[in-house]
């Protein structure tokens, strides 16, 4: 289909039995079941291929995606990362480029809050370390949303002058700049304080509402361009 063969030793998985790969792919995500979520991530079909093939190829990744294999396999730990979020934080831009060109969402979110639609994207992880500016540059070049709000934006969280410059050159704004540009109400979570303590459910709901307000304003502005 892509002019490549899964049996070509150049692109082969590091597994003896190719039939096992075929069966695993037909079952979508996992090579084998495991209780530990980090092992599940490592053994998710696409990630297994990217990390273990002698010469991973984006066309083979597309082949797997078109047959149901998925990138959205999240660690069930504190951060809800996929391996791609780990790569972004660790400056693994080569693996990220391979995955995104193979069909992964350049704005893939964590599952820090599984109930929210506004978790941090790959770009947030990239800009959180000054040394990972090459990942930041790659994600921007591949179309990452530089103004996605959670309700903070990547520019709010960015560390290092190169990350900040890359974001600003791409049109990134802080959440406060977005608020002022579109004349939106100021962030105010004071109502989430009850008897001197923060009600986390109320705060999470307010974060989602305010995130939607910011993101909708950006989206509407883009649509009217």
Where are these regions (language model features)?
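Ankyrin-repeat-protein effector appendages
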Residues: 142, 159-225
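Ankyrin-repeat boundary/"N-cap" motif
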Residues: 8-15, 39-51, 73-84, 109-125, ...
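Ankyrin-repeat inter-repeat connecting loop/turn
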Residues: 6, 39, 71-73, 106, ...
């Amino acid at each position: 289909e892509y002019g490549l063969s899964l049996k070509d030793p150049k692109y082969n998985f590091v597994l003896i039995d190719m039939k096992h790969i075929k069966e695993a792919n037909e079952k979508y995500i996992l090579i084998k079941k495991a209780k530990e979520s980090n092992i599940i991530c490592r053994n998710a079909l696409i990630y297994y291929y990217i990390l273990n093939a002698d010469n991973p190829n984006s066309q083979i990744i597309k082949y797997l995606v078109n047959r149901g294999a998925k990138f959205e396999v999240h660690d069930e730990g504190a951060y809800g990362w996929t391996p791609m979020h780990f790569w972004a934080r660790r400056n693994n831009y080569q693996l990220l480029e391979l995955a995104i060109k193979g069909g992964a969402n350049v704005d893939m979110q964590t599952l820090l809050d599984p109930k929210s639609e506004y978790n941090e994207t790959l770009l947030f992880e990239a800009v959180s370390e000054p040394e990972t500016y090459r990942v930041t540059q790659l994600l921007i070049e591949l179309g990452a949303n530089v103004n996605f709000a959670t309700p903070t934006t990547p520019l709010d969280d960015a560390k290092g002058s190169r990350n900040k410059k890359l974001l600003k050159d791409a049109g990134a704004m802080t959440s406060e700049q977005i608020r002022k540009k579109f004349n939106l109400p100021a962030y105010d979570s004071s109502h989430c304080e009850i008897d001197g303590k923060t009600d986390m459910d109320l705060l999470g709901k307010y974060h989602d509402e305010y995130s939607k307000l910011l993101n909708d304003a950006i989206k509407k502005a883009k649509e009217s361009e």
